[in-house]
Amino acid sequence: MMRQMRGAAAVLALLLLAGCAGKPVQESPVATDEGIPAGQITLYGEIHGIAAIKEYEAERWKECYDRGMRHLFVESPYYTAQWLNLWMDAEGDEILEQLHRDWEGTYASGAETLDFYRTIKEQCPETVFHGTDVGHQYDSTGARYRDYLEEQGLTDTEDYRLTLEAIEQGQTFYRAEDDAYRENTMADNFIREFDALDGESVMGIYGGAHIALDGVDYNSGTVPAMAAQLKERYGDAVHTEDITWMGQSAEPQGTDTLTVAGK
């Protein structure tokens, strides 16, 4: 009887996570009180700058959030996510609007990006963002966050160290436009942030090329894609859904972040 009860609980946990992920997932042996298996990574692969995709992602995050998730990983630098976390606690939109100005000329420059983040703040106010990309906008967003920490007397903190590290990552990437370096760094940064959560499940939103479990980096094709590297480390805890098909007939706004060095 006890074995049957455990089996039923496991099935329930799987069904709950499947709703969050948008597709069936594999079994995990441990579940949280909310019914989501612990230590799971659900990644959505998008075409950047498509309103319908951002709306879909906001809906998927709301489902995850309602079932107990709080940590949302995004294809942004560490310091950008930290600004977003400060904005989540702020009354106004000044921080978000400044970030949006920093994103001018990139795929994040459209109104759909503002709508996405505002929806999350309104519907999922305890969301914690984690940025795992190299340091895009290092001389604007990155420098401003570094200066903010210095003004607050927080130079002897992990926050400050990771900010400087992200800035250096951006400078290294744009100096050589080394896509293999970026892909490996994204995986390393993801692992650092995920392992620090001590078993909590997370959702992530990245470009479609980064979440291919059998893929390689977008341009050089010389190293495994980020998700493939995560799969190697975490095995069946990694789940992906490619939603690029939703943007096949749509025209993204802006230009690729990779073409706007440090801006």
Model-derived segments and spans:
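Bacterial N-terminal signal peptides that target proteins for export
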Residues: 1-9
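Compositional signal for N-terminal targeting/processing segments
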Residues: 21-263
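C-terminal motif of bacterial Sec signal peptides marking the signal peptidase cleavage site
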Residues: 16-19
